[in-house]
């Protein structure tokens, strides 16, 4: 591990697959929330509800919330990587639309 972050070295990973699927439609299913923890009320936090994420990205949900005293957690690094992928898709789409718009403007003179 490195200070301030987790280990991300390729040499520590197996079955690496770059995400080529379109992510943006699935990202739209995530529901950001603001909330307070019951045990630490008074401090507003931002994040997601694990049970909501479970519907779209079960692989990002940690723990066993089904057990009597179990709770769910989230792999926020995983959510971040999907968010970056979605942002990349959006940038490429905007660039394509800008190019098409400029081509139409040029045709109209």
Language-model-detected regions and their locations in the chain:
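Short, conserved beta-strand/beta-arch hydrophobic-aromatic motifs that form part
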Residues: 45-47
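Active-site-adjacent helical/loop segments in soluble small-molecule enzymes
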Residues: 53
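Stable alpha-helical elements in mature extracytoplasmic
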Residues: 23-26, 83
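Small/polar residue-rich beta-strand/coil "junction" motifs that cap repeat-based extracellular fibers
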Residues: 1-18, 22
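Functional cleft and adjacent loop/helix regions within the main domain
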Residues: 30-40
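C-terminal intramolecular chaperone/auto-processing assembly modules
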Residues: 8, 15, 59, 63-109
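A generic structural signal for nonpolar/aromatic side chains embedded in well-ordered alpha-helices
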Residues: 16, 27-30
């Amino acid at each position: 591990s490195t200070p301030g972050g987790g280990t991300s070295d390729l040499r520590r990973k197996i079955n690496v697959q770059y995400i080529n699927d379109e992510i943006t439609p699935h990202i739209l299913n995530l529901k950001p929330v603001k909330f307070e923890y019951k045990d630490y009320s008074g401090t507003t936090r931002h994040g997601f509800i694990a049970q909501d994420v479970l519907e779209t990205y079960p692989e990002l949900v940690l723990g066993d919330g089904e057990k009597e005293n179990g709770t769910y957690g989230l792999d926020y690094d995983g959510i971040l990587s999907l968010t970056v992928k979605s942002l990349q898709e959006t940038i490429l789409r905007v660039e394509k639309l800008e190019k098409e718009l400029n081509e139409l403007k040029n045709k109209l003179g």
